[in-house]
Curated annotation (Swiss-Prot):
Residues with attached carbohydrate: 105, 138, 321
Species whose genome carries this gene: Arabidopsis thaliana
Name of the protein this chain belongs to: GDSL esterase/lipase At1g28670
Signal sequence, renumbered to the chain: 1-24
Family: Belongs to the 'GDSL' lipolytic enzyme family.
GO molecular function, one term: hydrolase activity, acting on ester bonds
Active site per the UniProt annotation: 42 (nucleophile), 346, 349
Amino acid sequence: MASSLKKLISSFLLVLYSTTIIVASSESRCRRFKSIISFGDSIADTGNYLHLSDVNHLPQSAFLPYGESFFHPPSGRASNGRLIIDFIAEFLGLPYVPPYFGSQNVSFEQGINFAVYGATALDRAFLLGKGIESDFTNVSLSVQLDTFKQILPNLCASSTRDCKEMLGDSLILMGEIGGNDYNYPFFEGKSINEIKELVPLIVKAISSAIVDLIDLGGKTFLVPGGFPTGCSAAYLTLFQTVAEKDQDPLTGCYPLLNEFGEHHNEQLKTELKRLQKFYPHVNIIYADYHNSLYRFYQEPAKYGFKNKPLAACCGVGGKYNFTIGKECGYEGVNYCQNPSEYVNWDGYHLTEAAYQKMTEGILNGPYATPAFDWSCLGSGTVDT
C-alpha cells in the first residue's frame, strides 16, 4: 500500500513538474530589464556602420534627410528618426542603445548594440562561395557575437553584476537579421528557388547565436521575423513588370515575395519553439514584424498613413518614388515634408512613424509570441 502511494505521489509530482515546464515555456515572465543587447542589421543599427565607414565614403545615413525628424545631426540610423530598438528603450526607461563600433567614452552598462547596416546572418565567405556578393560589410552575425564575447569580461568588470547576471537582466534583441542574406541574391538576379535553399541555414545561424547567448547567461530574447518585402518600394521596382501582373488587389504588394518571407518566418518560429522546449527557463519571444507592418498596407488610413503606403518618402522617379542607384541621400533626391504620413522612408527602410506603431503592436500585442508581461512595471501600455 505504501509502495503504491509513493508511486502515485511520484507520478503526480512528475505531471505537476511537466505542467510547470509547459507553462513556463509558453508564457513570458515579467522582468525589469536593466539593459538591451542588440545584434542585427540596418533595422537595428544605431550608428555602427557609420563609424565603421571610411570618412571619405560615408553612407547616405550620415547625411540629411536621414534623422531629420529626431536626431540632429544624423546618427547613422536608416530612417528619418527613431527605430524599433529606440522605442523599446524608451518604453523600458533606458537610454538609447549606443553602437559599440567607434564609440568612445561611452558607458555600455545599460545597453550595447552590434547591429550593422548590411549585415548578414551567414558569413560573407560562405555567401561568396554561393556566388552571392555582400559588399556592404563583413560584420555578420557570427562576427558580432564573437566581438561581444571578446569584450564581455570588460563589460562585466565595469558593472556591479557578474556576467551571467548582466545577461540575465538584459533584453537581447536578435535582429532583424537574415533579410540581407536574401536581399543580395534577389538583387543579383538569383531565382527564388536558389534563394530558398538559404532559409534553413539562416535559421540555424540565428538559433546557434541564441544558444551561445543562453550559455553565457541570456534569459530573455526578442527574435524578429522578416518584413513583407513584397510591399517594399525597392522590391516592387525591381520586380515591377511581374509584380503588376500579380499584385494583391487590396494592397498592391507582390504576393510571391511575401509568401517567401512567410516561409522564412514559419521556419524561424518552428526553430524557436524547439529551442523554447529545450530551454524552459528562458523566454524566447517571436516578434512578428511581417504582420505588424502588413496591416499598414491593408488599412493605411486607420493607422494615420494618408499617402500611398507603398511609395518612398525620400526618393525619386517611378511609380514608387524609388530609383535603384539614385536613392535617398544622393544629390538631387528630395524627401516628403510629411514623413509621419508615410510607411516607407527610402525604399528599403521605414519611417519613424511606422516603426513606432510596429513597436506598439509588438510590446502590447498581438504581434509578440508569447506576449510580453509588463505587470511588474506598473504600466500595461507603450507610451512613446
